[in-house]
Amino acid sequence: MESQIQQLQQEIDEYQIRNAGELEAFKLEFTVRKGKIAGLFGQLKTVDSADRPRIGQLLNALKQAAEKKIEEAESCFAQKADADAPSIDLSLPGRRSFCGSEHPAQKVLGDMKRIFTAMGFSIATGPELELDEYNFDRLNFPPNHPARDMQDTFFITRGQPDGDVLLRTHTSPVQVRVMLDEKPPIRVICPGKVYRNEAISARSYCVFHQLEGLYIDKNVSFADLKATIYSFARQMFGSDVKLRFRPSFFPFTEPSAEVDVTCYLCGGKGCRVCKKSGWLEIMGCGMVHPNVMKNCGIDPEEWTGYAFGMGVDRTALLRYKIDDIRLLFENDVRMLSQFTA
């Protein structure tokens, strides 16, 4: 028994522990419940009672030697890890935390939502991947309308039994879904991201944010529409802003108009931004076309309504005097940091 202890002591002394794997192997061989040291302790009961105290002391010393070797290895590995870790100079000044800010387009969209919800409008949303039934058909777009061409719309699939699938070109499909799901009176705004196959320039982009509004009730008139837009424009651009309504055409409204405000840069005198006109377009609007009402299951003889739509990003350009819409989508921190609160 004593010779076995001496042999095991020699094995422990000569065992090389160079990494965590070898340390684990050492523990499994010597110190676990079924290891070599535990095996010798199990044989202690077979030793003569006169020699048992002395052999027990030798076994305890053997166990302590193994545990000490483990502690030394773990301490060595910990010191090496500390030495390899990157040093930290606590005397250096700390880095200032970066103060983020809300994106200018999101600031404008948030203000738009607050203005219209204060007027009694609720917020409705819908899918960006849309069927042409909701994007075109129910909105009174004729089959040969240019907006249905590949040059203007991003089609995902065409010629499917359930209809063409596309990236919505406006948030008007949300209005259609609301009219199909709810009964009048209806008063909603529909903010969201839209997509158009347009050339990218300082004034246009292939993806942008839009907010549209819809109000349907009895005896709604164009005068109600003008009052709503005037109230919005004064809260959005200032009480001294001037507006003008120009006759226009949209398949889903009749009569239709486009709304301009005085140019933010020249104050109406004429400059390169407003193309010497003194005016900048902010939205399109009009009375909901009777065909749209019929397509959505609403009787146009009983109900009337108005709709409007505006580009959130273009409104942000107006408010913050940004001359290139591409800046809103490039995520250049040098530009965005100017809007830090």
UniProtKB/Swiss-Prot annotation:
EC code: 6.1.1.20
InterPro entries membership: aa-tRNA-synth_II, aa-tRNA-synth_II/BPL/LPL, Phe-tRNA-synth_IIc_asu, Phe-tRNA_ligase_II_N, Phe_tRNA_ligase_alpha1_bac, Phenylalanyl-tRNA_Synthase, tRNA-bd_arm
GO process annotations (BP): phenylalanyl-tRNA aminoacylation
Cofactor binding note: Binds 2 magnesium ions per tetramer.
Keywords: Aminoacyl-tRNA synthetase, ATP-binding, Cytoplasm, Ligase, Magnesium, Metal-binding, Nucleotide-binding, Protein biosynthesis
Ranges in a coiled coil: none
Annotated GO CC locations: cytoplasm
Chain sites annotated for binding Mg(2+): E254
Cofactor: Mg(2+)
Catalytic activity: tRNA(Phe) + L-phenylalanine + ATP = L-phenylalanyl-tRNA(Phe) + AMP + diphosphate + H(+)
Subunit organization: Tetramer of two alpha and two beta subunits.
NCBIfam families: pheS (TIGR00468)
Membership in a protein family: Belongs to the class-II aminoacyl-tRNA synthetase family. Phe-tRNA synthetase alpha subunit type 1 subfamily.
Name of this chain's protein: Phenylalanine--tRNA ligase alpha subunit
Gene: pheS
